[in-house]
Structure formats: C-alpha cells, structure tokens
C-alpha cells in the first residue's frame, strides 16, 4: 500500500484564493487587511520566511509592512516599535520573526503584541484561551494541519493521536487542537522512553521535533495518517522532514511531503488569521 499524499501546496492555493476574496471585500469597505512583519538581524532562514510572508500578502491583496533591523537593535527600541504598531489602525496583524538575537527576551516581545493583533497565536492570552477552546488566533502551523485533516475527511473523533514534540509553537497547541476535536492524544518528546510503542498504536502521528528520521516505517501502524512538520537537511543538503518519507509512505494511509506539505499551510493560516483580525476590526468600527 502506498500512502495518499496530502498536498499542502494545492490546499494552500484554494484557501489563499478564499482569503483573497475576503481581503477584496474588506478593502472595498475601506478596511484592507494589514500585516506588519519585524525581522531583527540577518538570519538567512528568517529572511527567506519573511520574504515568503510578504509575497503571500502582496499576492492576495493584503497591505504589508516589513521592518528589518540590525542585530544590534535594543530590546527597548523593538518594544517601542511594537507599541506603535499596536496603535496603528492599518495593521491587523503583528509578527516578530523568531529567533531573536540573544540580548532580546522573545517572551517579553511576544507579550508586548496586542492579543487582538497576535496573528501567530503565541501571546499568553491566546495560548491560554486555546486551552478553553476559544482563542482569538490559533498558532498557524497546527491550525494548518487541522485544515489538512478537514480537507481530506480524516476522522479525529475517537482517534488515537501521537504528537512528537512539545514546543509552544507546534507540539503543545497541536495536542490541544486534536484534543478539542475529540482525539485521544499522547505527547511524546526527547525524554519519552519507547517512542515506537506509542506511535505503533496511533491512528494519527504528527512529527514536530526537527530531527531527521525520528519516525521510520516500523514505527507506524498500517493505514495511519502521518503529518511531517519537521524542516531539516539531508546529507546532500536537500530539504527533508522528521519522517523517513520513502519508508513510511509504504505503510501509512496518508502522508505529508517535505517540502510541499505543512510548510505552505503555515503561511496560508497566517493570512487567514490576519483576515479574521481585520474582519473583527471592521465590525467594531461599523
């Protein structure tokens, strides 16, 4: 059996077209959705991510603002800029590209963003609200994964789901969203004693640790859905995920590729979160 591919590029295209329609409707009413992206330092990977986010905005009728600062920018100056953007009615989403230079406290920076403009969903107000199932914004990567399940009719209610990884950005919110959808969720991580014992029982596995081949074919239940959130490089320097794709695709029922799986969905959900913020702002102004 060869797994069916969950194509993140194709689903993204559909969702972005819907986002563009909503953006056009808002713009016609004088409320063009606006996203501000802040980059501090010259991390090459961060520069690529920021460029892709700005391009996605431009391609879909959003207003976008990119603030690029040297790595020497002080924490106080960064916080002052965030406070300015919090007050700017043209901006509906504020995103600070992580990681930040060591002298800047990323927790303090995220907490400075107004919760109603926290389109990454990282602010403690949104992270806490996710626990109750009522966040203003869901973190983009796990939100994108949930849209993939929805698009392919993958049943979550009663399913055994394993999330490998416990980060605040992917692992923890992914587990909460699966739990909210009725799955029985196990979170595994670097201290988990027997990872394979957990994954072999899982109907759904989400791998999100940033470690190549953490999930191999012998660890997967036949027919399971495997979502690969990892972004790594193989020995030849080629982009790969956390899953041994060649092996696992022969066992799984559904699988996401890397690249072209979860990655495009992350930026798409950033657009959706920004649209939702703009729609709330427009309704409040009406």
Curated annotation (Swiss-Prot):
Among Gene3D superfamilies, the record links this protein to:
Leucine Dehydrogenase, chain A, domain 1, NAD(P)-binding Rossmann-like Domain
According to its UniProt entry, one GO biological process term is: purine nucleotide biosynthetic process
Which Pfam family is one of this chain's hits? THF_DHG_CYH_C
Which EC number applies? Answer: 1.5.1.5, 3.5.4.9
| A GO MF term | methenyltetrahydrofolate cyclohydrolase activity
Keywords (A to Z) from UniProt: Amino-acid biosynthesis, Histidine biosynthesis, Hydrolase, Methionine biosynthesis, Multifunctional enzyme, NADP, One-carbon metabolism, Oxidoreductase, Purine biosynthesis
Question: In what pathway does it function?
Answer: One-carbon metabolism; tetrahydrofolate interconversion
Q: Does the record's keyword annotation contain Nucleus? A: no
SUPFAM superfamilies named among the record's database cross-references: Aminoacid dehydrogenase-like, N-terminal domain (SSF53223), NAD(P)-binding Rossmann-fold domains (SSF51735)
Oxidoreductase as a keyword? Answer: yes
* Entry superkingdom: Bacteria
PROSITE patterns found in the cross-reference section: THF_DHG_CYH_1, THF_DHG_CYH_2
Q: Which reaction(s) are listed as its catalytic activity? A: (6R)-5,10-methylene-5,6,7,8-tetrahydrofolate + NADP(+) = (6R)-5,10-methenyltetrahydrofolate + NADPH; (6R)-5,10-methenyltetrahydrofolate + H2O = (6R)-10-formyltetrahydrofolate + H(+)
Report residues binding NADP(+).
165-167, 190
GO cellular component terms, alphabetically, are: cytosol
InterPro entries this protein is in? Answer: Aminoacid_DH-like_N_sf, NAD(P)-bd_dom_sf, THF_DH/CycHdrlase, THF_DH/CycHdrlase_cat_dom, THF_DH/CycHdrlase_CS, THF_DH/CycHdrlase_NAD-bd_dom
The annotated subunit structure for this chain is:
Homodimer.
Write out the similarity annotation. Belongs to the tetrahydrofolate dehydrogenase/cyclohydrolase family.
Function text: Catalyzes the oxidation of 5,10-methylenetetrahydrofolate to 5,10-methenyltetrahydrofolate and then the hydrolysis of 5,10-methenyltetrahydrofolate to 10-formyltetrahydrofolate.
User: PANTHER family recorded for this chain?
Assistant: C-1-TETRAHYDROFOLATE SYNTHASE, CYTOPLASMIC (PTHR48099:SF5), C-1-TETRAHYDROFOLATE SYNTHASE, CYTOPLASMIC-RELATED (PTHR48099)
Query: How is this protein named in the record?
Result: Bifunctional protein FolD
Q: What are the top taxonomic ranks of the organism?
A: Bacteria, Pseudomonadati, Pseudomonadota, Betaproteobacteria, Burkholderiales
């Amino acid at each position: 059996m060869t797994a069916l591919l969950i194509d993140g590029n194709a689903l993204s295209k559909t969702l972005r077209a819907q986002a563009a329609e909503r953006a056009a409707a808002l713009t016609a009413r004088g409320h063009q959705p606006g996203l501000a992206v802040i980059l501090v330092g010259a991390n090459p990977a961060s520069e690529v991510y920021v460029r892709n986010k700005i391009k996605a905005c431009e391609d879909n009728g959003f207003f976008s603002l990119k603030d690029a600062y040297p790595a020497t920018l002080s924490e106080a100056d960064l916080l002052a800029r965030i406070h300015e953007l919090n007050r700017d009615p043209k901006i509906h989403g504020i995103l600070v590209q992580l990681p930040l230079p060591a002298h800047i406290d990323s927790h303090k920076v995220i907490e400075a963003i107004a919760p109603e403009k926290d389109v990454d969903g990282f602010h403690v107000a949104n992270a806490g609200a996710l626990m109750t199932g009522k966040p203003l914004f869901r973190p983009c990567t796990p939100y994108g994964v949930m849209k993939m399940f929805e698009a392919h009719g993958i049943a979550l209610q009663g399913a055994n789901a394993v999330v490998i990884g416990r980060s605040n950005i992917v692992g923890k919110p992914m587990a909460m969203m699966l739990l909210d959808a009725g799955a029985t969720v196990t979170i595994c991580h670097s201290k988990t004693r027997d990872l394979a014992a957990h994954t072999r029982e899982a109907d759904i596995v989400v791998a999100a640790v940033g470690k190549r081949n953490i999930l191999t074919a012998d660890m997967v239940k036949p027919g399971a859905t495997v979502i690969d959130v990892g972004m790594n490089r193989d020995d030849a320097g080629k982009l790969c995920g956390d899953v041994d794709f060649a092996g696992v695709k022969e066992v799984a029922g559904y699988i996401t590729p890397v690249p072209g799986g979860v990655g495009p969905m992350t930026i798409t959900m950033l657009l959706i979160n920004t649209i939702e913020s703009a729609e709330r702002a427009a309704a409040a102004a009406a």
